C-alpha cells in the first residue's frame, strides 16, 4: 500500500479540526448554561471577574475563555487581559430575543449523543425513532433555534407574504399551528394579533404542557394548545393552518 503523505496530512488535519469542534461544542453548551456569554455581553471582564460574576471557578473559566477566544466565539483584549463579546457574537450567543440562537442549535446536536445507542440499533434494524423518544434537550434546542428565526421573520415578513392573511388575522380569525412544539411560533402570532384565536397542536404531550406554561407566563389569552397529531386534530374552520416547527417532517407527496 502506498500512502500519499500530503493527502494523509490533509485528512488528519480535517479530523483534528473535527475533534476540536466537538470539544468546543461541549464548551458552548457549558458557557450557555452557566451564563458566561450573557455576562460578557456589553462589558469586558478578566477571567477572575467573569468567574466572580457567574459564581464559577476562575481556573475553569480561564480555560473556557482561552478555547472560546481561539475559536472566535469571544474576543480578547490582550493589553488588559480582558474578554468580551463583539456585537455579532452577542447577537448570536447572548440575545434571547435576537434573530439567531446558536446555543439552541448546539442543544439539538447534543441530543445526537444521547440517542447514540438507539441510533446504532436503528442502523441494524432499519427502524426509526419517534420525536418524543429523544432527549428533552432536543425539544428545548429546537424551540430556541427556531424561535430566533420566528422573532426576526414570522410576523414581519413570512405572514405578510401570504395574500390577505395579515388582514384576516388583524380583523379576527382562527388559526392552527400544527407541530407547534413548545409553542414559540403560536405565542408570537397570538401576541401580534390579539383579536385572533390560535390553536397550537402537537402529538408530544410534554411539549404541549410546556407550550401551555409558556403562553401563561407571556400573558397570552388568545392561544391554547392541544395534544393531537397532524391527521386527527379537531376543527375544520381555520382561516390559517401553519406548519412551522414540523415543516421538515412533512410529506409533500
PLM features per residue range, with description:
Residues 112-248, 253:
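Conserved adenosyl
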Residues 35, 45, 252:
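Residue-level recognition of oxygen-bearing side chains
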Amino acid at each position: 500500500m502506498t500512502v500519499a503523505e500530503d493527502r494523509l496530512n490533509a485528512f488528519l488535519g480535517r479530523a483534528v479540526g473535527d475533534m476540536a469542534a466537538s470539544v468546543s461544542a461541549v464548551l458552548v453548551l457549558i458557557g450557555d448554561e452557566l451564563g458566561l456569554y450573557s455576562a460578557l455581553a456589553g462589558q469586558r471582564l478578566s477571567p477572575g471577574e467573569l468567574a466572580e460574576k457567574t459564581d464559577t471557578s476562575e481556573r475553569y473559566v480561564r480555560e473556557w475563555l482561552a478555547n472560546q477566544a481561539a475559536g472566535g466565539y469571544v474576543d480578547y483584549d490582550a493589553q488588559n487581559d480582558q474578554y468580551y463579546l463583539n456585537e455579532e457574537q452577542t447577537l448570536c450567543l447572548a440575545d434571547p430575543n435576537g434573530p439567531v440562537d446558536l446555543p439552541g442549535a448546539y442543544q439539538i446536536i447534543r441530543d445526537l449523543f444521547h440517542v447514540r445507542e438507539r441510533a446504532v440499533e436503528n442502523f441494524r434494524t432499519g427502524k426509526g425513532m419517534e420525536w418524543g423518544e429523544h432527549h428533552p434537550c432536543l425539544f428545548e434546542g429546537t424551540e430556541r433555534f427556531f424561535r430566533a428565526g420566528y422573532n426576526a421573520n414570522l410576523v414581519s415578513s413570512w405572514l405578510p407574504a401570504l395574500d390577505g392573511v395579515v388582514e384576516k388575522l388583524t380583523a379576527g380569525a382562527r388559526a392552527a399551528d400544527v407541530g407547534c412544539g413548545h409553542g414559540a411560533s403560536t405565542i408570537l402570532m397570538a401576541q401580534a394579533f390579539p383579536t385572533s384565536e390560535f390553536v397550537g397542536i402537537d402529538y408530544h404531550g410534554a411539549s404541549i404542557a410546556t407550550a401551555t406554561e409558556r403562553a401563561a407566563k407571556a400573558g397570552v389569552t388568545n392561544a391554547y394548545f392541544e395534544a393531537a397529531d397532524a391527521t386527527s386534530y379537531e376543527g375544520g374552520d381555520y382561516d390559517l393552518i401553519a406548519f412551522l416547527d414540523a415543516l421538515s417532517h412533512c410529506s409533500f407527496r
